[in-house]
């Protein structure tokens, strides 16, 4: 799945096919790749319908080429499919923190218990593992081996067939020994299709242990079948979250991820390999960046981020025009950094007021002068203190000299920056409260 979509992105961005035809071909490739990854067909066609709708309704910002803009929309919509901005909270909310792992047989639950213990141990927590899976003969030995490998204590009773009794004793002992995080590996004797029995046992164990988190472990290879299991689990345990394992070994990982997200359950981690450290917190945007090929879309995402940051500065300017506060040099600094993210300065310099190059078509020499001025002003801003950026009025002649020395500039250049800043604040107060005036001030709309 990942390779197919990544190849489609590269082909789309570097190919010579006419734009409209290239878009149609890409959408078809995207649909095929997602469906072959076992993503629900309805979800796939809903996704591509949203992409097409945005293409028809929205206009690309001037800092993005049409193809770049299209890929940024694909990135947005795919991120929503896999969970959007939701960031799982993996930090314990109290100590000790009891985690109960549940999952059907073969889901990789015991291996995940070891990985989870290692994840928290690396972060400085004292971790204890409880082996309460009595139905799989090798479960205790496997957990003991993992515990020895990572230096984590394991409690288990190989001759006791009562999982609830073992879990209760193990938790009590680890609480007494002042463990920060206690992970209970519960029984996994039921297969897929036997969710009712699994959830009944989970409830029984939950009532005794009163854990702080219940995590359902799902094998990625079941694809969209994960929907039924995750849905029933989410209804039975609203505080619970999900770990999807074996993402590296199946083409159905996208199907499992999208299915779990569709239930409303939170995906906390994904397993990305067999090694003990191959467990990562799940982040939809990071996952989608990987799908699309981070090297191919990084510059596009950087431009979009710059555009978002620039919009924040524009809103701040609107507030200043309404008499709410004052533009600071920190705002100016943020504005310049945002513009730099949006592409070569030669393409965005005309949007910065007061540089004397706001012509319909600035000459190459004018652009070079402007770029150099921006670079030198940034050096000056980097040499100022936090207080000076917030209130430039405190900068006296002595500080001007120090700032100039620290940034390799002439004192006159620092003075010019401060004069430009003061002029800009005066301009903002004079301009009427209309978006058109702000755009005029900035040489035209960017977004």
Swiss-Prot record:
It catalyses: GTP + H2O = GDP + phosphate + H(+). The keyword Hydrolase applies. The gene is srp54. The lineage of its organism: Archaea, Thermoproteota, Thermoprotei, Sulfolobales, Sulfolobaceae. Its EC number is 3.6.5.4. It holds the Pfam family SRP54_N. It is found in: Cytoplasm. GTP binds at residues 103-110, 185-189, 245-248. One of its GO terms (biological process) is SRP-dependent cotranslational protein targeting to membrane. GO terms for cellular component: signal recognition particle. It comes from Saccharolobus solfataricus (strain ATCC 35092 / DSM 1617 / JCM 11322 / P2). Part of the signal recognition particle protein translocation system, which is composed of SRP and FtsY. Archaeal SRP consists of a 7S RNA molecule of 300 nucleotides and two protein subunits: SRP54 and SRP19. InterPro entries: AAA+_ATPase, P-loop_NTPase, Signal_recog_part_SRP54_M_sf, Signal_recog_particl_SRP54_hlx, Signal_recog_particle_SRP54_M, SRP/SRP_N, SRP54, SRP54_GTPase_dom. Keywords: Cytoplasm, GTP-binding, Hydrolase, Nucleotide-binding, Ribonucleoprotein, RNA-binding, Signal recognition particle. This is Signal recognition particle 54 kDa protein.
């Amino acid at each position: 799945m990942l390779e197919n979509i990544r190849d489609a992105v590269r082909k789309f961005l570097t190919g010579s096919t006419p734009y409209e035809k290239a878009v149609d071909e890409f959408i078809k490739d995207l649909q095929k790749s997602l469906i072959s990854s076992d993503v629900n067909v309805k979800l796939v066609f809903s996704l591509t319908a949203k992409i097409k709708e945005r293409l028809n309704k929205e206009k690309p910002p001037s800092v993005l080429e049409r193809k770049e803009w299209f890929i940024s929309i694909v990135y947005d919509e795919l991120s929503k499919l896999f969970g959007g901005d939701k960031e799982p909270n993996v930090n314990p909310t109290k100590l000790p923190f009891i985690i109960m792992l549940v999952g059907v047989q073969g889901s990789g639950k015991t291996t995940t218990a070891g990985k989870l213990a290692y994840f928290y141990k690396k972060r400085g927590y004292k971790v204890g593992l409880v082996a309460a899976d009595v139905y799989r003969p090798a479960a205790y030995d496997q957990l003991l081996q993992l515990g020895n490998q990572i230096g984590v204590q394991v409690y288990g009773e190989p001759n006791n067939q009562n999982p609830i009794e073992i879990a209760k004793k193990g938790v009590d002992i680890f609480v007494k020994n002042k463990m920060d995080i206690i992970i209970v590996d519960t029984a996994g004797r039921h297969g897929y299709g036997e969710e009712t029995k699994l959830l009944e046992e989970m409830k029984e164990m939950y009532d005794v242990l009163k854990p702080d988190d219940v995590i359902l472990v799902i094998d990625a290879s079941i694809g969209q079948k994960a929907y039924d299991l995750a849905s029933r689990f989410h209804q039975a345990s609203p505080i619970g979250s999900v770990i999807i394992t074996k993402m590296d070994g199946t083409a159905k990982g996208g199907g499992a991820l999208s299915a779990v997200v569709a239930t409303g359950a939170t995906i906390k981690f994904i397993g990305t390999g067999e090694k003990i450290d191959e467990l990562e917190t799940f982040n939809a945007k990071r996952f989608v960046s990987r799908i699309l090929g981070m090297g191919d879309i990084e510059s596009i995402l950087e431009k979009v981020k710059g555009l978002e940051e620039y919009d924040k500065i524009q809103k701040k300017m609107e507030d200043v025009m309404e008499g709410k506060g004052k533009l600071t040099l920190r705002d100016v600094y943020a504005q310049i950094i945002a513009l730099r993210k949006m592409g070569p300065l030669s393409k965005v310099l005309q949007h910065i007021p007061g540089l004397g190059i706001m012509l319909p078509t600035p000459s190459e020499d004018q652009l070079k002068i402007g770029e150099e001025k921006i670079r030198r002003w940034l050096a000056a801003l980097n040499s100022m203190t936090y207080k000076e950026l917030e209130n430039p009025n405190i900068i006296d002649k002595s500080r001007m000299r120090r700032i100039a020395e620290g940034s390799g500039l002439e004192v006159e250049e620092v003075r010019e920056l401060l004069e430009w800043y003061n002029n800009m604040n005066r301009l903002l107060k004079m301009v009427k409260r209309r978006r058109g005036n702000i755009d005029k001030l900035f040489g035209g709309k960017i977004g």
